Amino acid sequence: MRTAFIASLFALGAGMTLAAPVSSKAEADVEARGNRGAHITWYGGHMLDDPYCGGTRPTDGDLVAATPWDSPYGCGDKIHFDYWGKQVTVTVVDKCDTCSGTWFDISKGAFSRLASLDVGELHHVDFWRV
């Protein structure tokens, strides 16, 4: 009797696993949204001159970012930042010489969507590729 009960539980668990497969896209979404701890500063003015990715010089109001040289995010990639419910999506147009790891420089326009420019820098910001 005990063996039959254990076998029934095993069969039930296997059936539940097969009934609710997780797509690779869903797994990728969870992984993509799992990035935490970004350090964000803002840049603008002449620092926007001659962006690494080329193209038109961005303005302070454009929603753009500079990434560390070792970042997996490259030219044209879009990164979404979420800071205490305030959100912005930026396009990578530049590299940041003083940034490393998960430190990003974003334009004044992008930063101001997350916090006041007077704050200067943000820590523990969630981010993911979009």
Where in this protein do the model-derived segments appear?
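Secreted/periplasmic proteins
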Residues: 2-11, 15-130
